[in-house]
A protein has these predicted regions:
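A charged, aromatic-enriched C-terminal amphipathic alpha-helix characteristic of glycosyltransferases
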Residues: 130-163
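A structural motif in glycosyltransferase catalytic domains
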Residues: 8-11, 24, 119, 152
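A conserved mid-protein helix/loop that constitutes part of the nucleotide-sugar donor-binding site
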Residues: 1-14, 31-37
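Short hydrophobic beta-strand element within catalytic cores of glycosyltransferases
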Residues: 90-94
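A short hydrophobic beta-strand element within the catalytic core of glycosyltransferases
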Residues: 68-69
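Nucleotide-activated donor-binding/catalytic signature segment of Leloir-type glycosyltransferases, i.e.
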Residues: 37-53
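Aromatic "clamp/platform" in nucleotide-sugar-dependent glycosyltransferases that forms part
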Residues: 54, 73
């Protein structure tokens, strides 16, 4: 539910209308997996959506991806978003993803109030032709374990205050 898969599929459907050779890869499983697969089928684009299940080797996929989309309804610090930025992927997060996660100039925050078509247009306008190495991204971002620790620590404090 929190990952907003229905909206993700709607975005992809609009994006696929712009770039018809695109494929959506969904990694992970959950209680709503069958419902999400059925929704993809009803949307008429299930042939262009691949459900890869749980993976322990997601880092191997980053070089094959063109973008990462997280139109989440709520989110902590998404490690997948950090990893994708290390791989120099353009990332599209909803405004519900903490802005502290962003350290790349290819990180975009889009409101969930925008339509799937608007999301798709923004994603389609991104230049995916040039990607830097992980090392140069880390140097540019000054990203290190201390930075990651501070982000996680602040999130834990925020959660603790809610209890």
């Amino acid at each position: 539910y929190s990952k907003n898969h229905r909206f993700l599929i709607e975005i992809f459907k609009e994006f696929h209308a712009i770039k018809n050779n695109s494929v959506l890869l969904i990694i992970g499983t959950g209680d709503m997996e069958e419902e999400i697969k059925n929704y993809a089928k009803k949307s008429g684009i299930d042939d262009d959506i691949k459900f890869l299940g749980n993976r322990n080797d997601i880092e191997k996929f980053y070089q094959a991806f063109d973008v990462l989309m997280l139109p989440s309804l709520f989110e902590g610090v998404p490690l997948v978003g950090i990893e994708a930025q290390f791989a120099d992927l353009p990332c599209f997060f909803s405004e519900k993803v903490p802005t502290e996660v962003a350290f790349s100039d290819k990180t975009n925050f889009i409101s969930l109030n925008q339509s799937a078509k608007e999301w798709a247009r923004e994603i389609a306008n991104v230049d995916i032709s040039h990607r830097d190495s992980e090392r140069s991204i880390l140097i540019k971002a000054d990203y290190n374990i201390q930075t990651a620790y501070k982000i996680l620590e602040s999130k834990y404090y925020e959660l603790f205050e809610l209890i």
